[in-house]
From Swiss-Prot:
Keywords: Endoplasmic reticulum, Glycoprotein, Secreted, Signal. It is found in: Secreted; Endoplasmic reticulum. One of its GO terms (cellular component) is extracellular region. This is Serine/threonine-rich protein adg2. InterPro entries: GPI-anchor_Adhesion_Reg. Residues 1-19 form the signal peptide. PANTHER family: SERINE/THREONINE-RICH PROTEIN ADG2-RELATED, SERINE_THREONINE-RICH PROTEIN ADG2. Residues 526-651 are annotated as: Disordered. Glycans are attached at residues 77, 159, 204, 224, 274, 297, 327, 351, 370, 381, 405, 424, 435, 459, 478, 489, 513.
Length: 670
């Protein structure tokens, strides 16, 4: 896989019209920082007389370029000055036009620059490596793998792209050992299974040792309803009928995976690795709350009711409700559809749209400021009769009488006679009064506010605001009803329609409405509802990880991981394919599948295919009934080992790395 760069394209275009070619340095040459180095090139007669010399590096990040000097091209050699240069790989010499540096005449191969402290370079045979894999299934359940590879420096963070570049002296050899451990707690639900996995690496070279490790702990909470989760349960003993009820909330934690090592120096070409993980977690569940306290309504809920009032249940946000209360204090706020019945002793009036504002203790009174009537008023010593046309008529009877005719009804009468005041201007009315009773009937629209002692009343759009302690009180901010009010000495009945909402609280309850709401506090005193959750919540995760890496532009390793987790089992499948620069030439394919069930049993299968050999292995074990599944394994014992002969070429080390990466997940199984 050859890197395509803008400079490379310009070189190709320049070579069409010029024959200049750089011979020294060549590919894989090694220069030393702070030393004089030779430059050699060849020209043809059509080449320019002069050129600028640049030192560039497009492999390292960020790319660099540095002007060095101007040369006479037909000299065909020059001396590169002793400069302080950063050690690394990917350097090139570039000859450009003295008038326009974007015009490139020639460019050298890629070479190395090492530090000037005297690091030696030892030439020898081509680097060879041997990879050995040994797997055994015994009571301890352990697997290990080791290999010799070029030293590298890699830093990994979750969902990131990994780049590393390092150089060191020949010969180079790195020992890598990998150890993993896992402990899985399996108990009878609840709670769900939780697990802790750890992974560590130790990398030692002749120059710099390094090590890294990470630990991941996962768990699941007991519940996950549609939108609410209990925050505390005071006493689980009082909720013995529940099917799955925790005494505390279990949280799930996860530590990001981080693998790091010290910076190393080696001649190993750059590696580039990309790891991408995608997936989703789904948790389902439902809960039902049943209780034996306090209310029954549709969409408006009392805020306070004593324990003697009916129970409240709700499974919808739109319904019709009847609320009944006796000798209690009920506060009603909100708008909504509903009806209610109030009982008091004694009440006084019946009307449609206008209600008396003041009544003596023994005689009803009625006041009105209405000024629009056509009236005839007749008075004698014993009676007053009022009749009219237009907006209303009325008859008054009293002893003795008081008035003459006018268009406004009297606003003041002695205590033994009714009084009438009204702010309503539109109704048809007949009014009859005696020393003890005022009866008013009529139709129309209006509004009024009244306070009386000892009774209270309701009308079409305004509800009483105050009542004595022995009688229910009712307040409302609702202003839209259609109402019929009837009163006798003992009963006031109010019915109406509208819309509204409210919030209910009480001294020892909890409630449910709309869809699924789980109580946040349960009191152990009094009559407490039970809590049940059914079915038990389940969590599952499915996703795919893709890991690809390349080295030395000759090999490519691709790892695909597919995994699915649920309370029943966890299955992970990893397939790693290593290819040369030609995709049709597959160096190796390794597939690993591992499954761990809820009961503690596990199995794994590995199939590795190489041009000359194939390895297949299947292992399984079943835990005992103890809490820790890692404490017991099958008594059977099986082991397999494989040694791969070294192969020529720089792809050998990557091939071994790929094999090691594939076998690592097997260690988590045991």
């Amino acid at each position: 896989m050859r890197r395509l760069t803008i400079s490379g394209l310009l070189i190709s275009l320049a070579k069409l019209c010029a024959g200049m070619e750089i011979n020294v340095p060549s590919s894989s040459d090694v220069w030393t920082s702070g030393h004089i180095e030779p430059l050699e090139w060849s020209v043809v007669s059509t080449d320019p007389l002069q050129a600028n010399v640049w030192l560039i590096n497009e492999v390292e990040y960020p790319p660099t370029s540095r002007y060095i000097m101007t040369i006479n091209t037909f000299d065909e050699n020059a001396t590169f000055p002793a400069l302080d240069l950063s050690p690394g790989y990917g350097y090139q010499i570039s000859f450009t036009s003295i008038r326009d540096d974007s015009v490139i005449y020639a460019q050298s191969g890629t070479f190395y620059i090492v530090g000037g402290e005297g690091i030696s370079s030892t030439t020898g045979s081509t680097f060879q490596s041997m990879t050995t894999f040994t797997s055994s299934q015994t009571n301890s359940g352990h697997a290990s793998a080791s290999t010799s590879i070029p030293s590298t420096a890699i830093t990994v963070t979750a969902n990131s792209t990994i780049y590393s570049s390092a150089t060191s002296s020949f010969p180079y050899s790195t020992d890598v050992s990998v150890s993993t451990g896992t402990s899985t707690d399996i108990v009878t639900l609840p709670p769900p299974a939780s697990s802790t996995s750890s992974f560590s690496t130790i990398t030692n070279t002749s120059m710099i040792p390094s090590s890294s490790s990470f630990t991941t702990t996962t768990g699941s909470p007991y519940y996950n309803t549609s939108s609410f989760l209990p925050s505390s349960v005071i006493s689980s003993a009082s909720l013995s009928s529940s099917s799955v009820l925790p005494t505390s909330i279990i949280t799930s934690t996860s530590t990001p995976v981080t693998v790091s090592s010290s910076s190393l120096s080696s001649f190993t070409p750059s590696y580039s690795t990309n790891l991408t993980t995608t997936g989703s977690t789904t948790t389902t569940g439902s809960a039902t709350v049943s209780s034996s306290p306090f209310y029954s309504n549709s969409s408006v809920i009392p805020t306070s009711v004593p324990s003697s009032v009916s129970s409240f249940t709700s499974s919808s946000s739109s319904y019709t409700t009847t609320l009944t209360a006796s000798n209690t204090s009920v506060t009603y706020t909100g708008t909504g559809t509903g009806s209610a019945t109030f009982t008091s002793s004694p009440p006084f009036y019946s009307n449609s749209s206008v209600i008396p504002t003041s009544v003596p203790s023994s005689v009803s009174s009625f006041t009105s400021s209405n000024s629009s009537y056509t009236t005839t008023l007749t008075a004698s010593n014993t009676s007053i009769t009022y009749t009219g046309t237009g907006t209303g008529s009325a008859t008054f009877t009293s002893s003795p009488p008081f008035y003459s005719n006018s268009s406004v009804i009297p606003t003041s009468v002695p205590s033994s006679v009714s009084s009438f005041t009204s702010s309503n201007s539109s109704y048809t009315t007949t009014l009859t009064a005696s020393n003890t009773t005022v009866t008013f009937t009529g139709t129309g629209t209006g509004s009024a506010t009244f306070t009386s002692s000892p009774p209270f009343y309701s009308n079409s759009s305004v509800i009483p605001t105050s009542a004595p302690s022995s009688v229910s009180s009712f307040t409302s901010s609702n202003s839209s009803y259609t109402t019929t009010l009837t009163a006798s000495n003992t009963t006031v009945t109010f019915t109406g329609t509208g819309t509204g909402s409210a919030t209910a609280t009480s001294s020892s309850p909890y409630y449910s409405n709309s869809s699924i709401i789980v109580p946040t506090t349960v009191s152990t005193s009094g009559s407490v509802s039970s809590f049940s959750s059914s079915p038990s919540p389940t969590s599952s995760f499915s996703g795919t990880s893709a890991l690809s890496s390349s080295s030395n532009e000759e090999t490519t390793t691709t790892t695909q991981v597919t995994y699915t987790t649920s309370p029943e089992e966890t299955t992970t499948t990893m397939t790693t394919t290593t290819c040369s620069s030609r995709p049709e030439e597959t160096i190796s394919t390794v597939s690993t599948t591992s499954t761990v069930s809820e009961s503690g049993s596990s199995s794994a299968s590995i199939t590795s295919t190489y041009p000359s050999s194939t390895l297949s292995m299947t292992t399984s074990h079943l835990s005992s009934s103890s809490v820790h599944s890692s404490s017991a394994h099958s008594s059977s014992s099986r082991s397999s080992s494989m040694s791969l002969p070294p192969s020529a070429g720089s792809s050998t080390s990557l091939q071994r790395i790929s094999l090691l990466c594939v076998f690592i997940p097997l260690l988590f199984l045991f």
